Amino acid sequence: MMKEETRTGIGLKDVSIRLVSESPLLPVGGFVYCEYGIPVRYLKIDENEVKLEISVEKLKNLSRVCENIEQVVDKVVEELRYALPEGVFTIAKVYANGIKLRELSYLEEYTSVGKGIIIDEDRELDQEMPAYVKENRETILGTIREVILLELMYSS
């Protein structure tokens, strides 16, 4: 849940997730179908780091032509869900306009690849994802959804 002291405000241009792992990562999209297109970019920073960037400005433009922008934002969140790596130890760092979201800082831990939110562990893909990892993923995606919707509602 967003709090009043959030550092995001009107004028938000992008929200991004930096994924860092001990293993090589590939930027892979979930290819979620959306009538208007999904404004998510996949950037490979280096072998073990990928950036997923959501253009809030493009979503603002879409909100002018879409009847239900909330559905489009849900598609963006679904795309992010599919793009998160599984089966390898990975941390996430979430930014809005290049500034780390402090609403998620309570989830951050110091790890071998830096400080961030653990979104998966080394495991076989047929093994169940640990409960805290699932919760971390859902918290990240829910917060991103809320930040974007608040921006779209109050900036128009």
From Swiss-Prot:
Coiled-coil segments: 43-84
Entry annotated with the keyword Coiled coil: yes
Entry keyword Coiled coil: yes
UniProt entry keywords in alphabetical sequence: Coiled coil
Name this polypeptide is given: Uncharacterized protein aq_1295
